[in-house]
Amino acid sequence: MPIIAPISRDERRLMQKAIHKTHDKNYARRLTAMLMLHRGDRVSDVARTLCCARSSVGRWINWFTQSGVEGLKSLPAGRARRWPFEHICTLLRELVKHSPGDFGYQRSRWSTELLAIKINEITGCQLNAGTVRRWLPSAGIVWRRAAPTLRIRDPHKDEKMAAIHKALDECSAEHPVFYEDEVDIHLNPKIGADWQLRGQQKRVVTPGQNEKYYLAGALHSGTGKVSCVGGNSKSSALFISLLKRLKATYRRAKTITLIVDNYIIHKSRETQSWLKENPKFRVIYQPVYSPWVNHVERLWQALHDTITRNHQCSSMWQLLKKVRHFMETVSPFPGGKHGLAKV
């Protein structure tokens, strides 16, 4: 006769499913023991089959009788947290929004020691800096390089953003919208992180005498197709050359809208004169100091990450050969798997 209360069929199925899915083998053993006892096996047989002591089976029976299946689950390893974890994580998230200087400290950046001091001052706890360091990832806080910016707000930002959103909403085959920008290609490689053996820093050979080349690119906001032209100077002629390329490529378009930054070549007399002669083109200037508005910036970042960082080219023609191959294979962007393409 079973020595535990009868287990319903649905509950037995849930217990069997938990045994199959759980990664906790001790929890699986306890569930198996209860199912064997329900089947009518003796405690001695269960202990022998599961390689455990009879006293352990008796303890599991008490847990199951008092709390059901939940009572058989394993407790977390280690001792319980001594301090209010959630409350302290909330404080950490609020503190990192400010600078230590806001609280009278001379440091410009937070350290774990300083965070621990401030948390202890607010809560009255006695946290160690090492504990704060372990808790930071759980609070969603990571160590990252900051990005420079200016506290200058474009007074016409809302109007410009409204015009950009309206153009994007109306994007179609007859009215395509492009993100446009220029990028500098340097012969001297940009230095970036790479996988390397500990203590053996990689060396990147540089030509020494730098050379430059410039690309003007347009990213179709709908299809992700990339169009670009190159030149030896970043001038109005380069921008106009790209406009001519778009005009020839999208002959059936009734209007062509470009979202550009406020660089001088986009507003020069030469550019304005060409735009007057080609009313098909419409230029929308993004808000000042808002590069994230222009999605073609992501394309240039991908170009640098894929080609120009740590490159081994000794001459500009070798580097430009790789750059042109990248620009030919990057469409549609994003999603073209440019990082896996072969030469």
UniProtKB/Swiss-Prot annotation:
Tell me one GO molecular function of this protein.
nucleic acid binding
Superkingdom per UniProt: Bacteria
Q: Which residues cross the membrane?
A: none
Alphabetical keyword list: Transposable element
Pfam families reported for this sequence? DDE_3 (PF13358), HTH_23 (PF13384)
InterPro entries xrefs: Homeodomain-like_sf (IPR009057), RNaseH-like_sf (IPR012337), RNaseH_sf (IPR036397), Tc1-like_DDE_dom (IPR038717), Transpos_IS630-like (IPR047655)
The protein here is known as Insertion element IS630 uncharacterized 39 kDa protein
